[in-house]
Regions:
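A Rossmann-like FAD-binding core segment of flavoenzymes
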Residues: 42-130, 134-140
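Phosphate-coordination loops involved in phosphoryl transfer and adenosine-cofactor binding
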Residues: 21-24, 88, 97, 154
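FAD-site-proximal beta/loop scaffold in flavoenzymes
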Residues: 5-14, 99, 118-165
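Catalytic cores of large soluble enzymes that bind and process phosphate-bearing ligands
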Residues: 2, 26-33, 83, 95, ...
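Short, ordered loop/turn segments at secondary-structure junctions
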Residues: 1, 9, 53-56, 90, ...
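A generic local secondary-structure boundary/capping motif
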Residues: 15-17, 37-41, 92, 109-110, ...
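Rossmann-like NAD(P)H-binding beta-loop-alpha module
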Residues: 2, 11-58
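Flexible, glycine/proline-enriched loop segments at strand-loop-helix junctions
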Residues: 23-28, 32, 61-63, 116-119, ...
Length: 165
């Protein structure tokens, strides 16, 4: 259904010039990418109505409790807070005739219909660091540490993409 994208996809489209000013957006799924995608949309003039986090509050609290180990990420998380953030929530249905017009959200077990122009979904995007770790690359802030040229801590070993944060 046009108007429905991945959360990372919407973020990339916006950074590539997609105009979203004035659009009503719902972001749904799991993980910190939801907050980053919502912030990108909002910074570009979109009205982010809800961030529907699939994880329960206990899981979100467990994740948040780990953030003080990485002060930079803790500060970033604080700047990404959104009043429409709801844990224990998920999309039940995307509604529209030829284009997205609304979504049905389950928020804490209660169904709510939200009129919107875009839905961005992302579920459990976690960078895979296994190869870099196995090779002995230095890890910083849950990512492979790289310099400005994408070189890792190992000579002649480079990394790019999500694994580098």
């Amino acid at each position: 259904l046009p108007g429905v994208t991945g959360a990372g996809g919407l973020q990339a489209l916006i950074k590539g010039g997609l105009p979203v000013a004035g659009e009503r957006i719902v972001v749904a799924g799991s993980g910190p990418l939801l907050l980053a995608s919502a912030a990108t949309a909002q910074d570009n003039g979109a009205q982010v109505l809800n961030i529907a986090e699939q994880a329960h509050w206990s899981a979100v609290a467990g994740f948040a409790a780990q953030l003080p180990r990485w002060p930079g990420k803790l500060l970033q998380a604080c700047t990404l807070f959104h009043p429409g953030y709801r844990a224990n929530s998920h999309v039940v249905e995307a509604l529209g005739d030829g284009r997205l017009q609304a979504v049905r959200l389950s928020i804490g077990g209660r169904i709510r219909k939200v009129a919107c122009d875009r839905l961005a979904c992302g579920f459990g995007l976690i960078a895979n660091l296994q190869l870099g770790q196995a090779l002995g690359c230095r890890i910083e802030l849950n990512a492979l540490a790289v310099d400005d040229w994408q070189a890792t801590s190992l000579a002649d070993h480079y990394a790019a993409g999500e694994s580098t944060g």
